[in-house]
């Protein structure tokens, strides 16, 4: 047994020191090849730049929206103002048309009344005072220039006013009317009326063209992409264009009204 134990103890076995050295070598190799995973931190510079760019982009976008919105408001107000100007001209045309017709009627009737009354009184005066001072002065003035010369000659008018009879009083009243209306001529009144009507129609056409041009610019701006979305969200709608009105909606001078505009004697001649 002792010999056996001695053989076992002395038998070749494992070298523990060598094993320890191998183990230490493995540990050293493991430590050498260990990958250290340390978190990387981004630099503050790139992050700050990205934040600045983002903020500036948002500010620029909002500023663009506000500027475009203000442009829509300006164009809308300009369109409404020009529409109002057009409607004002329409109302003015409607008001002045009736006034011009009435004014022409009054002038024509007044002129007709004056010359008709003068003619009647002249005839009565000539028949009643042939050879007298009234008849002689009246005939002389009529030969010099007719009724216009009679009314314009102050000396002859005063001579007639000094005579007896109703003709002198009537002529005095007539001269007072003529002095108040020195240019009572129906032809000129008609010309002025037609000129005024033409001017009003030209102004209305100009106002309509101005409005349609403004409406076209406004409609283009609110319908272009991508601003049509902004216009839809903010409630801007297309402006309607003015079209030419039908003839029935425009004031016209009918044949009946034209006959009323004529002096009475001319109207009677036309009817005949």
From Swiss-Prot:
Annotated compartments: Magnetosome membrane
Any one of the GO CC terms: magnetosome membrane
Chain segments annotated as transmembrane: 47-67
UniProt entry tagged with the keyword rRNA-binding: no
Induction of the gene: Part of the probable 18 gene mamAB operon.
Membrane topology: Single-pass membrane protein
Residue pairs linked by disulfide bridges in the UniProt entry: none
Positions on the Lumenal side per record topology: 68-272
Cytoplasmic face of the membrane: 1-46
Domain of life: Bacteria
Recorded phenotype for the gene knockout or disruption: When both copies of this protein (amb0972 and amb1005) are deleted cells have no magnetic response and no magnetosome membranes. Deletion of just amb0972 leads to an intermediate magnetic response and still makes magnetosome membranes. A careful electron cryotomography exam shows that in the double deletion empty vesicles that might be magnetosome precursors are present. Deletion of genes mamH to mamV (amb0961 to amb0978) gives cells with no magnetosomes and no magnetic response.
InterPro entries on file: LemA-like_dom_sf, MamQ_LemA
Keywords: Biomineralization, Magnetosome, Membrane, Transmembrane, Transmembrane helix
Family: Belongs to the LemA family.
Further remark: This bacteria makes up to 20 cubo-octahedral magnetosomes of about 45 nm in diameter which contain membrane-bound crystals of magnetite (Fe(3)O(4)). Expression of just the minimal mamAB gene cluster (amb0961 to amb0978), including this gene, is sufficient to form a minimal magnetosome chain with small magnetite particles.
Biological role: Essential for magnetosome formation. Can be used to induce magnetosome formation.
Protein name in the entry: Magnetosome protein MamQ 1
Organism per entry: Paramagnetospirillum magneticum (strain ATCC 700264 / AMB-1) (Magnetospirillum magneticum)
């Amino acid at each position: 047994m002792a010999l056996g134990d001695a053989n076992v103890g002395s038998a070749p076995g494992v070298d523990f020191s060598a094993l320890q050295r191998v183990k230490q070598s493995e540990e050293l190799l493991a430590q050498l090849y260990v990958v250290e995973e340390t978190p990387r931190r981004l630099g503050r510079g790139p992050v700050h730049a990205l934040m600045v760019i983002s903020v500036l982009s948002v500010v620029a976008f909002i500023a663009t929206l506000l500027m475009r919105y203000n442009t829509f408001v300006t164009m809308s107000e300009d369109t409404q103002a020009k529409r109002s100007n057009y409607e004002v001209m329409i109302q003015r045309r409607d008001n002045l048309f009736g006034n011009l017709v009435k004014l022409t009627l009054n002038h024509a009737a007044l002129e007709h009344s004056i010359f008709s009354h003068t003619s009647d009184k002249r005839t009565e005066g000539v028949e009643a005072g042939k050879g007298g001072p009234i008849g002689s002065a009246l005939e002389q003035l009529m030969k010099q220039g007719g009724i216009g010369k009679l009314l314009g000659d102050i000396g002859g008018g005063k001579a007639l006013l000094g005579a007896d009879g109703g003709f002198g009083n009537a002529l005095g009243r007539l001269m007072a009317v003529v002095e108040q209306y020195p240019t009572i001529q129906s032809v000129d009144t008609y010309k002025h009326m037609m000129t005024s009507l033409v001017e009003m129609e030209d102004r209305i056409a100009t106002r309509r063209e101005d409005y349609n041009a403004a409406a076209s610019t406004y409609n283009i701006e609110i319908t272009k992409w991508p601003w049509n979305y902004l216009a839809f969200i903010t409630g801007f709608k297309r402006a309607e264009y003015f079209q030419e009105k039908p003839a029935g909606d425009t004031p016209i001078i009918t044949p009946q009204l034209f006959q009323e505009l004529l002096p009475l004697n001319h109207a009677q001649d036309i009817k005949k």
